[in-house]
């Protein structure tokens, strides 16, 4: 059994004296584990850092075996990612989300969004938007997709500013007004890719919304808590935006 693909390194752990078990999010084969012989060598360690874009070949005698990776660099991002808290927490958060998915299930859309996130860590607001969309996609891939395109009460497709915490469906301003305190906020950029978040508050409200549904449908049923990297990422984004506005 063998294949070749491109991927992004998510994590590495030692295996024996010289090898490493490497976790890669691949384009066509999902999140995949494999052993890299000599993975702890000085030559290989810089390559096997989270965030690096790699060419990966996998081989195993049987499909159910972990198998062996041969990994070659396509582009190095890890050194840049450890320079800022936004990037460091961001790649950790993306990896934590991907670990909610079954291993080896292909999710090309998530892979492509992961690549975009890594490319935009130098713009905290853009990185926040992309990771927010990543969480919306995660809910969809896990079977708990949100319906944000039209009002659950009226069918209107404009002025959608709320989300029902019960149904995960959008609600327009007029229909939601009597129950506004019980509804989740829906910033306009979330369901319109032509729009951008205008400030940190937009991101904070959007992440509160996705966090509610991740907790309800994913973390609590699995007896898990939100990863620390999530709050770390949001705090880092907030600080970075405040600093840029002050300068």
From Swiss-Prot:
Nuclease keyword on record: no
GO BP annotation list: DNA recombination; double-strand break repair
Keywords (A to Z) from UniProt: DNA damage, DNA recombination, DNA repair
GO cellular component, one term: bacterial nucleoid
Entries under SUPFAM superfamilies matching the protein: ArfGap/RecO-like zinc finger (SSF57863), Nucleic acid-binding proteins (SSF50249)
InterPro entries: ARFGAP/RecO, DNA_rep/recomb_RecO_N, NA-bd_OB-fold, RecO, RecO_C
Source organism, top-level taxon: Bacteria
Function: Involved in DNA repair and RecF pathway recombination.
Protein family membership: Belongs to the RecO family.
Protein name, per record: DNA repair protein RecO
Gene: recO
């Amino acid at each position: 059994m063998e294949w070749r693909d491109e991927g992004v390194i998510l994590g590495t752990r030692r295996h024996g004296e010289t090898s490493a078990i490497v976790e890669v999010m691949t384009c066509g084969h999902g999140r995949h584990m494999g052993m890299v012989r000599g993975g702890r060598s000085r030559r290989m360690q810089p390559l096997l850092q989270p965030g690096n874009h790699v060419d990966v070949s996998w081989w195993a005698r049987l499909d159910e075996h972990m198998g062996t990776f041969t990994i070659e660099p396509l582009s190095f991002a890890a050194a840049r990612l450890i320079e800022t808290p936004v990037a460091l927490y961001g790649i950790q958060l993306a990896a934590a989300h991907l670990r909610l998915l079954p291993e080896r299930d292909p999710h090309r859309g998530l892979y492509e969004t992961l690549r975009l996130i890594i490319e935009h860590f130098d713009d905290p607001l853009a990185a926040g938007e992309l990771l927010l969309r990543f969480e919306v996609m995660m809910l969809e891939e896990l079977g708990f997709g949100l319906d944000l395109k039209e009002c659950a009460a009226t069918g209107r497709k404009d002025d959608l500013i709320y989300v029902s915490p019960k149904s995960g469906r959008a609600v327009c301003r007029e229909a939601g007004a009597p129950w506004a305190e019980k509804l989740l906020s829906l910033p306009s950029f979330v369901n319109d890719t032509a729009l951008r978040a205008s400030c940190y508050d937009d991101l904070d409200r959007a992440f509160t919304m996705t966090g509610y549904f991740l907790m309800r449908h994913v973390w609590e049923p699995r007896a898990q808590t939100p990863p620390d990297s999530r709050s770390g990422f949001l705090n880092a984004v907030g600080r970075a935006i405040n600093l840029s506005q002050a300068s």
